[in-house]
């Protein structure tokens, strides 16, 4: 399994299950330029079509395969492809010239939080991408693995929804935990 290409995924939750779970959005990873590109695009297309029938939006997740470089050129192409397939929003990663990726993508972008970072660094990431045009962040590890996840979620929300700088949000976080 370790040497297998993990970009060949299947849709784990069909539309009926998403409806039963009262899902607000469905997400599908896409592996543009990787071995699993065709199957991931097929999964995305089917999910978008099912979501459209029931008014459930689909988020296209730009995954980066092992052999892929995290360049602004790659992210600009991959986000554009996913958006033009019909997703309502795209999840991608921060990169050099990120504001160009946002400008080239016709739907809102949220940014993945990536690996677990210290709280101040995660808030800096959130601030940087929001200030460059991202509409939100998806920071699972950086919130759930924080020693103070509720306060960290509140600090991230301050950046995304209230215009706090990373420094202001970190100060807010520190005040909340002490």
Model-derived regions, located:
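Short acidic, glycine/serine/threonine-rich loops at helix termini
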Residues: 149
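Alpha/beta enzyme core
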Residues: 1-111, 116-139, 154, 158, ...
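Extended terminal accessory/targeting regions
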Residues: 175-178
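A short, acidic, flexible beta-alpha connecting loop/helix-capping segment that sits on the rim
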Residues: 141-145
């Amino acid at each position: 399994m370790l040497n297998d290409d993990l970009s060949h995924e299947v849709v784990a939750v069909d539309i009926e299950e998403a409806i039963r779970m009262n899902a607000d959005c469905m997400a599908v990873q896409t592996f543009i330029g990787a071995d699993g590109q065709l199957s991931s695009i097929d999964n995305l297309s089917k999910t978008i079509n099912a979501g459209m029938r029931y008014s459930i939006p689909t988020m296209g997740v730009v995954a980066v395969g092992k052999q892929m470089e995290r360049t602004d050129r790659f992210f600009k192409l991959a986000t554009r492809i996913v958006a033009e397939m019909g997703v309502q929003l795209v999840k991608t990663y921060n990169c050099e010239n990120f504001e160009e990726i946002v400008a080239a993508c016709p739907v809102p972008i949220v940014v993945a939080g990536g690996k677990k970072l210290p709280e101040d660094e995660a808030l800096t990431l959130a601030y940087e991408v929001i200030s460059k045009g991202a509409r939100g962040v998806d920071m699972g590890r950086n919130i759930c693995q924080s020693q103070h996840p509720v306060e960290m979620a509140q600090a991230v929300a301050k950046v995304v929804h209230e215009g706090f700088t990373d420094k202001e949000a970190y100060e807010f976080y520190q005040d909340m935990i002490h």
